[in-house]
Amino acid sequence: MSSVPQIKVPATYMRGGTSKGVFFKLDDLPEAAQVAGKARDQLLLRVIGSPDPYGKQIDGMGGATSSTSKTVILEKSAQSEHDVDYLFGQVSIDQPFVDWSGNCGNLTAAVGSFAISNGLVDAERIPENGICTVRIWQKNIQKTIIAHVPVTNGQVQETGDFELDGVTFPAAEVQIEFLDPADDGEEGGDMFPTGNVVDQLEVPEIGTFQATFINAGIPTIFLNAEDIGYQGTELQDHINGDNAALARFEKIRAYGAVQMGLIKDISEAAARQHTPKIAFVSQPKAYTSSSGKTVEAADVDLLVRALSMGKLHHAMMGTAAVAIGTAAAIPGTLVNLAAGGGEREAVRFGHPSGTLRVGAQAELIDGKWAVKKAIMSRSARVLMEGWVRVPGDTF
């Protein structure tokens, strides 16, 4: 049997928010992978260790969860008034595809840090000490994101005392602004794709549910927890070990995707695992988080649990947090009603790992709701930098 030597590609392994991923500069990729297509997808699949029928990603950099099966490609921005172009790829764990349909809000927190450290931000824009404002063009969703990255002695500051539920160790705070987060592109249409803040979602053999469909941060389907038999206090083990429940969620997600106009037939949902997300909400209740910490009902405005890539997320996807903050700011959505109704510019919600505060500024313009921006804080840190190796016949 002939052997094929491995090739090595410069890469950085980073945590951003409650996710981890492999970061690349576009011009560091092999030439065939510098353009979208089969070669790029095959490279990223092999880097992460997919597809893996065992579901472990042992032979790659992935961690066998939706939060750790991620890749990022960055380059100097081709857009005016922007520093860096950011492309995100969600790698399927057990299937041979990379989903490019949405953003990763958590890894967004690491984009600014990487861009500063890797020469993608003009040196004159980086303060010796203070906050560097990194202007990000998110290529998947065609939106602007602003990252406020702390800098000390001309270098990105990664350590600090900011605590983020779902991350064990404190780090430096990175504030993220998602400008005009509602999806007005070809696939999404208006913020509310049906024109309603609440719809009826009929799912054959499962039931009919109230649902809020929203395109903000990431396309998301919100349901009431009690309508689907939950309290809103559930942790991962309550749902991820129940294959029948996961199948029900996926069927609901598929029918919701059709109603949102994201796909034409439910059969297409299997190849679009990253979007839309599906989440369920409830009024505040006390619960014990996955770390053992008690979250009191008085600590939060509502509870939210969300699924990503077919599993209940261990904390909350950053883009889904944008959707939560946006929906909470708009009277009448299921998220807003779970939080007590009325107008608000910020909400603190409980998730499996603890709590998170997210703000959004909404206004009614010509009969349609618009959101100027959504804001939240995350943190980021370089875990490893060097080269990642893949067999030379990968692509």
Question: What kind of region is each of these model predictions?
Answer:
Residues 1-395:
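A glycine-rich beta-to-alpha transition motif near the start of alpha/beta enzyme domains, typified by
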